[in-house]
Amino acid sequence: MAVVAAALSPSGYKKVNEIIDGDEVLKSQGGGRTGGRQGGGIIPPPGDRAGGPPPAARGGGGGRGGIQFGRDEYYLAFVGAPSPTIPWILQFGGHHLAINVTVVGSSNVLTPSLPAAQPAKYTLNGQTIRPLGAENDKGFALINALTAEQQKQAILNYQVRDLVLGAGADGKVIQPEGMRASAMTPSQQAMLLDVAHEWVGILNDEAAGARMAELKANLPETWFAWSGSTKNGEVAYYRIQGPTVVIEYAPQQGDLDHIHTIYRDPTNDYGAKLVAK
C-alpha cells in the first residue's frame, strides 16, 4: 500500500482505506445487494502498451463464484514499467474501487477513477465511518444553497438511478444538463468547486492543485445537474460536467447504502491528451 499512498494525498489514501474497510464489513455480512452495475469495473488488465486507453475492462474484484468482497480482493497493477519518460499507469482497486493514476513525465492524471461505497455508513473501532460522506453532504449543501429559480434549472425532470458514464463508457460524451455555473453566485461557484475537490483531491496535492486551477478556469462552461430529493438523507443523484470533467454521484437503484461515483476527463482519460503530444 506504500506505493498507493505515495501517489495519493493523505485524504485520498484515507478515503481508499475507508472504502476497503467497508468492503470488509460487507464481506462479514455475507455480501450485499447488487443494484446496478458493480463498482470497480474500470480497471483494465495489464496491456502491452502504456499510455493510451487500456483494453476492455474486467469486472471489479471478481473471481470464481462471482464478485468477491474484502481487503484480500484488492489488487495493485502497473500498465507499463515506471519510467520518467515513457507513459505508464498505476492501478489499484477491486470491488467498489478503481484508481487509475497515469504518469506522463511529471504529470499525474487520476481519470477515470471510480470510488464507491457499500455500506455507505458503518462502525469501526467505535467510530462511524462514511467513506463518501463528504461527497453526499457537500452535494446536498450546494443544491440547497441555490434559490428556488436556480433549482428549477438544476433539477432534472426525470430520475437518474445509476451512473450515466460509468464503467465501459470511455470516450463517450453526453449533452450537458442542469444549470450553468456561470449563473451561480461566487459563493455557490466556490461550493461547486469544493464538491469537485472531493474527487480531484484524491490525487497528490501537486497534481490536484493544477487540476483544480483547470476546473476553475472552465467554470463558465461547467454545468451542475441534480435528480431526486433535495433533503439530505433521501435519494439523489448529481453530476458536474465541464469541458474537461465529468463527476457523477449515484445511489444504486435508490439504495442509500450502495453508492457509486465516477470521475472522468473526456479529453484526457488515461492521460490520452498528454500521450498524444
Residue ranges and their predicted role:
Residues 2-277:
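A cross-kingdom marker for long, charged
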